[in-house]
Amino acid sequence: MRIGSMVFFALCVITGPTFAQNTENDAGKGHDLATLVCANCHVAAADQRFTPILNPPAPSFESIAQRPDTTAQSLEKFMTTTHRGIDNPGGMPNPYLMDYQVKQITAYILSLRK
């Protein structure tokens, strides 16, 4: 039992910084991807180079991040589901992102929380 606890502790110490780096790295990649893919309709970043084509724009990523019901799971589900249809022709289309891209944009949005 004692050896198992020591191994678990060692793994936590070793993988903790790696997990933090991956999250930061994903957020950085998510920022870059969001300014390419999402900024056409959303204010995805303060440093994006153009104004969204929607008037008014879709919710900003910063405002989405501040919502109390925003979680990694809710963002990932939203980004992989179409919200357009006969009853909602103006809804957000499914951007058809790869799983890793969804995780990167999710990490970026969550990094905007204050």
Identify the residue ranges that each predicted region occupies.
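Axial heme c-ligation environment in periplasmic c-type cytochrome domains
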Residues: L54-A65, F78-T106
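Positively charged n-region of N-terminal signal peptides that target proteins for export
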Residues: M1-G4
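Electrostatic cytochrome c docking/interface patches
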Residues: G16-L33
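Bacterial N-terminal signal peptides
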Residues: M6-G16
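Short Cys/His-rich "knuckle" micro-motifs
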Residues: Q48-T51
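Short, low-complexity, Pro/Ser/Thr/Gly-rich segments in the mature regions of secreted, periplasmic
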Residues: I105-R113
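The canonical Cys-X-X-Cys-His
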Residues: T35-A45, I105
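Short, solvent-exposed mixed-charge patches
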Residues: Q21, R113-K114
